[in-house]
Amino acid sequence: HHMLQTATSRLQNTGAFLSDMVKWGESARIRAVTDDFTGLYNRRFFDDALKDSIQESILNGRPYSLVILDLDRFGTLNAEYGEAVGDSVIQAAVPVFIGVFDESDILSRYGGDEFAFILPGKTGEEALERCRKVCRGLRELEIPALEKGSFDHLSASIGIATCPIHGENTQELLDRADQALYAAKEAGRDRAVLYGMGKMK
C-alpha cells in the first residue's frame, strides 16, 4: 500500500514535471522564433517561412506576396531624439501592422527598423492595398515624444514582390521586393511600391 502511494505520488510529480517541461519547451520554442522586443517573428524564422511559402506557391499556384518595410529616416530620428524614443516608435508601429494584416500573414522584424511580411494567397495588388493602409496608419499615429523635434509624423517606405510572377526563389523575390523598396524611397518615401510599377531601377 505504502509502495503504491509512493509510486502514485511519484507519477503525479513526474506528470507535473513533464507538463512543466512541455510548457518550458513551448516558451523556449516561442522565444527561438520571435523577436523579444516586438513579439513579431524573428529573421531566422522568417527566412525559413519564406522558403516554405515559395514552394507552397509554386506547388498550388497560389500567389504569396513578400513585403519589405523600412521606417523612414529612422537613423536621423534615433540621432535626434535618442534611442529610447526610437525604440518606442518601433513598438508603436507594430500594432498598426497587426491591425492591417490578417492572422494568417507572417509578420517579422527583419532587423533594426526593417520589417518583412509574407501574405499567403494575396496578389501584389491586394498586398499593395494593405500596405497603403499601413502607410496611412503610421502617418496617423500620435507619438507625443516626436512633437518636440523635426518629425511631425512617422512614415514608412514599402516594397512588394509576389511569387511566382516576380520570382520563384528566395533571392529573386527578396531582390525584387528590395528594388521596389528602393523605388519607394526614390519617389519620396511614405509610400508602397509593387515591383514592376512605374520606374524601377
Where are these regions (language model features)?
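Regulatory sensory/coupling modules that transmit signals to nucleotide-handling catalytic cores
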Residues: 1-26, 162, 196-201
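Conserved nucleotide-binding and Mg2+-coordinating catalytic segments in signaling enzymes
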Residues: 28-48, 69-82, 91
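Short regulatory alpha-helical coupling segments
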Residues: 29-30, 43-63, 75, 94-102
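Heptad-repeat coiled-coil signal-transmission/dimerization helices
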Residues: 46, 50, 67, 89-90, ...
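Alpha-helical scaffold within the catalytic cores of cyclic-nucleotide enzymes
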Residues: 94-95, 126-145, 178
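Short catalytic/binding micro-motifs of nucleotide second-messenger systems
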Residues: 99-104, 136-149, 162, 181-183
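A short pre-motif secondary-structure segment
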Residues: 106-109
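Catalytic-core segments of nucleotide cyclases and related cyclic-nucleotide turnover enzymes
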Residues: 120, 128, 132, 148, ...
